């Protein structure tokens, strides 16, 4: 079932003929359950599992509330007000849409899987594959969108004299972000299966996750390393280089000529934007690096976790850290990066105060601005 980005293999004392369980990128495997099938004990009834269930339940509720409400506010404000539609915000909208879909579609099913039915899937194979697939696509859309934002900021700040990305190019880039994510995620749906596990006597759990055939283990590991390279290492390295050059340009390079108040405001605005984006990059690395590291050790050095009592607890802790990344993105983009809440409050006031018919308010005029929205810097200065 969908959890966060990872993969898995069977423990040494349990296997199914002709199959090798994996979960790239959003699944548990049989050993993730930490269920010793040769003992008369249901590990889902232990205190360790109970604590882990509470932790992941709280995390899922947090994602549903934060990402569901926060991204809805951002998307609604962006749709209504053209002043918010600069190129950076349009790229951010991809993260908002993907996280919003996960919050309202995937998380309720995950809550049922982890907390209500305690690692047992009750919704059929089609939904099992769809939820895993949507989770995977969402992760890669977020990663690719963050990379696109970093490159856009790099070109705008380090090479200001070069032509800026126009909306045709931005539309192509957004389509590319989704297309790459959709294609790379296909194996997560293709290899997703339901498998019945008998835990204690006649008690059963229905496992939902990717199951790769034994004779395709090499393909699985190659696929994981490919995804790890182009969806984590590559983007993180590129974004780090971009923000390093941007930081040098904004903080360590003298601005020639006389600095007007408008120039100083634009510089402060750019610095604020870049600081938020660097914080988001840092959060992305801190949240996902432990999970990728855990996954690599589990799949490429499986003996490390053999006989490990607290394997399940460690897996849940690492998973919850990874899951929190979407909440951090939402909080940063909605409450810090943009004036989204200001525009959303405007929209609510317009809805609940119909008495403004006689005169056009500034909020009304926002809807009738030019088709060419203000750049991020001009918009930032105007909102000061």
Curated annotation (Swiss-Prot):
Broad class of the protein's primary localization: membrane
Cystine bridges: 128-208
GO CC, one annotated term: plasma membrane
Cytoplasmic face of the membrane: 75-89, 159-171, 245-273, 335-384
Subcellular location: Cell membrane
Gene3D superfamilies tied to this protein: Rhodopsin 7-helix transmembrane proteins
The protein's name: Prokineticin receptor 2
Organism: Bos taurus
